[in-house]
Swiss-Prot record:
Its main location: cytoplasm. It is found in: Cytoplasm. PANTHER family: UREASE ACCESSORY PROTEIN F. This is Urease accessory protein UreF. The keyword Cytoplasm applies. It comes from the Bacteria. It comes from Paraburkholderia phymatum (strain DSM 17167 / CIP 108236 / LMG 21445 / STM815) (Burkholderia phymatum). Required for maturation of urease via the functional incorporation of the urease nickel metallocenter. Pfam families: UreF. The keyword Protein biosynthesis does not apply. One of its GO terms (cellular component) is cytoplasm. Keywords: Chaperone, Cytoplasm, Nickel insertion.
Amino acid sequence: MRIAELTALLHLASPALPIGAFSYSQGLEAAIEAQFITDADTACAWIRSGLSNVLAHGELPFLAHQIERWRTHDAAALIEGNREFLASRESAELRRETEQMGWSLRQLCASLEWGDAARRATLASMAPIAQPTAFAFAAIAHDAATDAALAAYAFSWVENQAAAALKAVPLGQLAGQRIIVALREPIDAAVRQALSTSPDDINTFAPQLGILSARHESQYSRLFRS
């Protein structure tokens, strides 16, 4: 991997990227309220399940196919894929999350003039835009390999989930680092699963997550927006 590609992906995966990821827990806070998560071990198991059963079969393969569509600049397929991903969000919170983060990342891409003008015009035409669609654009703008881009996206998700667990369970810093270390190999497996998934086989079925996310909307005390 080229150094420029590596640093670009580190940038996109960084918690310092100003797209608001820190304000979302993607149902983890509701899982704590429901006592599915009570300590470091149950937090790790929850995040592992989300990575292996939700991201690997849904969000990551969608991202992989959007990357290839950006690579060939198939605007019609990009727009349709973006619509399908938005339609797959199972609660208002999850829908607003991907729209807000997608919008913020698109604004960043435009402000930094990433990519060529034609692709930026296609990016600007999508409203609302899902975060994976915007992330796929940013990856292509830096000529990143698809597998490396998926690994960066998955690691960013795991890191954000661990950070949310630290605040909401709460856990110590070392426990959070153990979660991240424990999930490095599952990230590799999730990426390989995603790369082998055709568009017709993408699966976003996660009823427990959808129910918890809907319950989170009226949860009495919350730190996170999802």
